[in-house]
Structures are given as C-alpha cells and as structure tokens.
A protein has these predicted regions:
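Short Gly/aromatic-enriched secondary-structure transition segments
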Residues: 42-50
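Residue-level recognition of beta-strand termini and adjacent short loop/turns
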Residues: 8-10, 23
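Glycine-rich beta-strand-centered segment in the early N-terminal region that forms part
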Residues: 20-34, 49-101
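Histidine-centered active-site/metal-ligand motif
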Residues: 7, 42, 69
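Short glycine/threonine/proline-enriched tight-turn/helix- or strand-capping micro-motif at secondary-structure
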Residues: 11-17
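Short structural boundary motif marking the start of a folded domain
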Residues: 1-4
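Helix-loop element at the rim of GNAT/NAT acetyltransferase active sites that forms part
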Residues: 38
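Short beta-strand-to-turn element immediately C-terminal to the catalytic PLP-Schiff-base lysine
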Residues: 6, 44, 76-79
Length: 102
C-alpha cells in the first residue's frame, strides 16, 4: 500500500509499505478521510517533536512514521479479543497512546 512517511525535517516520502494486519486487541480501519493538522505541519518543518526516533514503549513505532492522525473510516478487520467494534462499523480515531492500565 502507499503511505506518506516522515523521515526528517522537510523530508516526507510517498512509499510502498506492507499493509498492516489487525493484531491482538487492535482493529484495522480503511481510511475514508484524513486531515493534516498543525502538529503534522510542525513535524514537517521542525520535527521530531512527537514522532518517536527510538522505539516507542507503548506503540513499538519509530521513525520513519506514517503521517496523518486525524482520520475516520470503517473497520475491515478485528484482532483477537476485540469486542466493542465489528467489521463494517464506522469509526473515528483518537490518536492517544495509553497504557490501558491507569
């Protein structure tokens, strides 16, 4: 699949990446709308600000990273243990990392 990824200040690239699978406790969303917000612009012009350069302890993500965190779409796959949404549900995403414990 194609994705816009941040590699560094003023260095974003459209790249072919592997399409993700719905892992345990997660869902896969087919994006139907994605906005570019102020934080995306700040990352482009002056980052990294929030983009993890080292592996993030909760997400496992690190740069280069796919941009665009304000999006909506519909669920196309659910991972093991997911019970609150099902395939076909329309969703919006709250892009906040949390441990889920506290």
């Amino acid at each position: 699949m194609k994705a816009l990824r941040w590699h560094g200040v003023k260095d974003i690239r459209v790249e072919d990446i592997e399409e993700p699978k719905a892992e345990k406790g997660k869902v896969k969303v087919k994006v139907e709308w994605c906005g570019i917000c102020g934080s995306d612009l700040h990352e482009y012009t002056a980052g990294p600000i929030f983009i993890p350069i080292e592996t993030h302890p909760l997400s496992g993500d690190k740069a280069p990273i796919v941009l665009g965190h304000e999006f909506s779409g519909h669920v196309v796959e659910v991972g093991e243990g997911v019970t609150k949404v099902q395939v076909g549900d329309r969703v919006v995403v709250e892009p906040i990392y949390a441990c889920g414990e506290c």
